[in-house]
UniProtKB/Swiss-Prot annotation:
NCBIfam families cross-referenced by the UniProt entry: PRK01202.1
Family the entry assigns: Belongs to the GcvH family.
Signal peptide: none
Keywords: Lipoyl
Protein name per the record: Probable glycine cleavage system H protein 2
Origin organism lineage: Archaea, Thermoproteota, Thermoprotei, Sulfolobales, Sulfolobaceae
Domain Lipoyl-binding, chain residue ranges per copy: 32-114
Protein purpose: The glycine cleavage system catalyzes the degradation of glycine. The H protein shuttles the methylamine group of glycine from the P protein to the T protein.
Gene3D superfamilies according to UniProt: 2.40.50.100
UniProt remark on cofactor binding: Binds 1 lipoyl cofactor covalently.
SUPFAM superfamilies: Single hybrid motif
Organism: Saccharolobus solfataricus (strain ATCC 35092 / DSM 1617 / JCM 11322 / P2)
N6-lipoyllysine modified-residue sites: K73
Length: 148
């Protein structure tokens, strides 16, 4: 785990980084990933008060919303890191969105997706490239991460 300005960056994840949108993906099986938002994203959003996650069985294109979130200062989409189908939804995150702020890489996961094309994972940031890209975003936004 790399920590930059109090922001946790797990090294074993894949990252979809587009502008200020930062989403992580963890390979659970050869064709299934777990998806959530990063520590940076939850810090920039502030206290998340509502999350709407696409229903199980929904097909989502890469970059299109797999969920939407609202906080006191922000509302917006959570992009799918790859194209695929929602196979499981974190009902606990929908019921108590604060867990996304408290544990974005653990209990605060959003969906599990069956990938249409597992090769798309190679297009995401990972390893040192991901760490460098996220560190640059932390610096440009002058962020210090905090958990609620």
């Amino acid at each position: 785990m790399v920590v930059e300005s109090n922001c946790e960056i797990p090294e074993n994840l894949y990252y979809f980084i587009e502008g200020k949108n930062t989403v992580w993906a963890k390979l659970e099986s050869p064709d299934t990933i777990v998806v959530g938002i990063t520590d940076l994203a939850q810090t920039m959003a502030g206290k998340i008060v509502k999350v709407r996650i696409k229903k199980k069985g929904t097909k989502v294109e890469k970059g299109r919303p797999v969920a939407t979130m609202e906080s006191g200062k922000w509302a917006g989409p959570v992009p799918a890191p790859v194209t695929g189908e929602v196979v499981e939804v974190n009902a606990e995150a929908e019921k108590s969105p604060i867990i996304i702020n408290q544990d974005p890489y653990g209990k605060g996961w959003l969906v599990k997706m069956k990938m249409s094309n597992p090769e798309e994972l190679k297009q995401l940031f990972s390893g040192q490239a991901a760490i460098q890209k996220l560190k640059e975003l932390i610096a440009s936004e002058k962020l210090t991460c905090k958990r609620l």
